[in-house]
Amino acid sequence: MNYIVFDLELTCWEGDMAGRFQEIIEIGAYKIDPYGHIQSQFSKFVKPVMYPILSPFCTKLTSITQEMITQAKPFKQVIKEFMDWAEIDIEPHYLIAWGDKDLDYLKADCLLHKIDTEWISSYTDLKKQYQKVKKLYEPKGLKHATESEGLEFEGTLHRAIDDAYNLTRIFTKYFGEWNLHKIN
């Protein structure tokens, strides 16, 4: 069993994004073994196709530059590399993210690029799980949750690999307490 703790960054614009499809521009992930130990990491930029030019707002929010995504591979190649790295076809796995939006965006980009989404069948929203484990009235953001655990947020907020790392720190801290479940 592999636990794949991941985060995504997407194309974005200031204000109303109605009618604009947000594409994945960065995937960051950590592979955790059945004992709660980090095995490896995955970090790739993705070249968007619908809106290939990043907005100034997106660059400011994520620190991802136009040059970074222009030089990146397209989603279809990057997601194949991700699936190979995560051993999706070899090992049982759970995908784990902070909130349910990353799942929606991952599925949407797969559908856009005509990639089967069956491999996204086991997913856990750790934000909801954290709220239950900590008995919080309302969910917290990742940075707040990290700092609430007495941990300094490491890296740059809204960079997929850094957000995934901080999420991994929370996931491994409470490793035996999560109620992981399969979605369909």
Model-predicted regions and their roles:
Residues Y94-D100, Y105-C110, K140-N184:
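Acidic, Mg2+-coordinating catalytic module of metal-dependent nucleases/exonucleases
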Residues F6, T124, D162:
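Active-site flanking residues adjacent to catalytic metal/cofactor-binding acidic residues
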Residues C110-I120:
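A short alpha->loop->secondary-structure connector
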Residues L10-C12, K128, N166:
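Short, glycine/acidic-enriched loop or turn micro-motifs at the edges of active sites
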Residues N2-K107, I120, E147-G155:
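Conserved non-catalytic scaffold segment of RNase H-like nuclease domains
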Residues T124-E138:
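Short alpha-helix plus adjacent loop in nuclease-associated cores
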